[in-house]
């Protein structure tokens, strides 16, 4: 390694240290906390929940009376008799539906279920956001680890290029070998630069999901390791059926369909309403400049009204029949979702088990590739293998290292998917 390389490494280390000092540390918990607070989709979903909570009110359901006030001033002028009349009228009235076939109670229950469904949809959004943040956070770590692998290969290629240049200066290497080594080094350097761009892009994606400015940089403190915990299928299936939020939402949707059936049935009952209030009127009249009318009235009133639809051309019957069909459809949708989720859970469990084994294979394979790379470097310098053999071994190491990193990421993704489908993320979000 020449002096220029040493100085370059020292300068790079100093720059990295300076940059790291200006970066905020970011572990996975902090990333999740920022996303749950700032994610745009969650902000919108929380606003929807606020609207549902406001609507969940007895006043919205129609339990309470309405009170209104009216005032008017009417003026008339008769041209033939040159008479003028004016009437001022004011009134305050109360209207109250005392009974409407239990519609008020059913409507209130429906509003509560709508709020519950909106809350459930927010929970699904939270689960999706948590899973996405986990995947993107570890995708950043994956890209950074791949960058380290590419840097290792690039440094080896640069060493080989410098080695060929030195041999050429001593008359021990031809131009062809130097150009071939230079081409390999520049290819590896281009791959390294492209990977640096991938790291920056992935960090920007993470910043967007957390609601942070794109240019913000972080010091990622989590280690790129996968949890190798084994799962029991029966336990996962039980948790999924009891805690999966999408399935819970489907049950709430069934309750809403039942509410709609009850509302349609309420049309078969009579309605009783109460009206009460007081009207005030004052009239004036003038003809030929003389007043001929000056009259004031104050009239309280109270009314009770009963109405009942005897025949409505089958509208009520059809409404109830359609509502009951929608109930049956909702039940079928529950069965369909439970079946689909069960299939998905079995697939995810199989993926997890296979990926555990693949990680073990990748770890063993990487150990062999690293040893082979170390041995081949000495063999290349001693002339036992040529540059093409050495390059093949470098590419094998690169491929194996990538496979091992991808195996770690795949196992992390499997665990995240299993946690989501069994409702495990909601416990974290509620803490």
Protein language model regions, located:
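Acidic, low-complexity, intrinsically disordered peripheral segments
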Residues: 403-431
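Sec/SRP-type N-terminal targeting helices
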Residues: 43-47, 60-61, 98-126, 176, ...
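Bacterial Sec-pathway N-terminal export signals of envelope proteins
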Residues: 21-68, 174, 214-258, 309, ...
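Small/polar, glycine/serine/threonine/aspartate-rich low-complexity segments that form flexible
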Residues: 23, 70-100, 107, 220-230, ...
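Periplasmic alpha-helical coiled-coil/stalk elements that build and connect Gram-negative outer-membrane
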Residues: 128-241, 348-351, 355, 397
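N-terminal signal peptide c-region/cleavage motif recognized by signal peptidases
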Residues: 15-19
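Short flexible linkers and secondary-structure junctions
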Residues: 23-139, 175, 272, 276, ...
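A short glycine-centered flexible hinge/capping loop motif at secondary-structure junctions
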Residues: 168-172, 380-384, 421
């Amino acid at each position: 390694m020449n002096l220029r390389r040493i100085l370059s490494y020292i300068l790079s280390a100093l720059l990295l240290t300076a940059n790291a000092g200006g970066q905020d540390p970011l572990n996975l918990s902090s990333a999740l906390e920022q996303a749950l607070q700032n994610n745009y989709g969650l902000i919108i979903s929380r606003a929807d929940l606020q609207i549902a909570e406001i609507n969940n009110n007895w006043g919205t359901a129609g339990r309470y009376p309405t009170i209104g006030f009216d005032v008017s001033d009417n003026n008339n002028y008769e041209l033939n008799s040159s008479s003028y009349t004016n009437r001022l009228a004011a009134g305050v009235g109360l209207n109250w539906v005392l009974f409407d076939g239990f519609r008020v109670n059913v409507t209130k229950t429906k509003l509560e279920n709508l709020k519950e469904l909106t809350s459930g949809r927010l929970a699904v959004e939270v689960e999706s956001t948590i899973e996405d943040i986990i995947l993107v956070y570890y995708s950043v770590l994956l890209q950074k680890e791949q960058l380290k692998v590419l840097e290792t290969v690039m440094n080896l290629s640069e060493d080989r290029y410098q080695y060929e240049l030195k041999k050429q200066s001593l008359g021990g290497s031809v131009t062809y070998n130097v150009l071939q080594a230079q081409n390999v080094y520049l290819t590896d350097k281009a791959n390294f630069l492209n990977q640096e761009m991938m790291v920056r892009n992935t960090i920007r994606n993470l910043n967007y999901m957390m609601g942070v400015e794109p240019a913000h940089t972080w010091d990622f403190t989590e280690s790129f390791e996968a949890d190798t915990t084994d799962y029991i299928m029966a336990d996962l299936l039980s948790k999924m059926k009891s805690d999966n939020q999408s399935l819970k939402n489907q049950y709430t949707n069934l309750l809403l369909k039942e509410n709609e059936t009850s509302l349609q049935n309420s049309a078969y009952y009579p309605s009783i309403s109460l009206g009460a209030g007081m009207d005030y009127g004052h009239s004036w009249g003038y003809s030929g400049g003389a007043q001929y009318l000056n009259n004031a009235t104050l009239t309280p009133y109270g009314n009770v009204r009963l109405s009942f639809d005897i025949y409505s051309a089958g509208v009520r019957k059809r409404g109830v029949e359609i509502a009951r069909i929608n109930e049956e459809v909702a039940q079928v949708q529950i069965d369909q979702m439970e079946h689909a989720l069960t299939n998905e859970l079995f697939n995810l469990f199989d993926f997890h088990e296979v990926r555990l084994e693949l990680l073990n294979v990748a770890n063993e394979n990487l150990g062999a590739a690293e040893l082979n790379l170390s041995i081949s470097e000495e063999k290349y310098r001693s002339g036992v293998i040529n540059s093409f053999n050495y390059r093949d071994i470098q590419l094998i190491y690169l491929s194996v290292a990538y496979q091992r990193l991808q195996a770690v990421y795949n196992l992390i993704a499997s665990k995240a998917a299993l946690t989501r489908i069994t409702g495990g993320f909601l416990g974290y979000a509620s803490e």
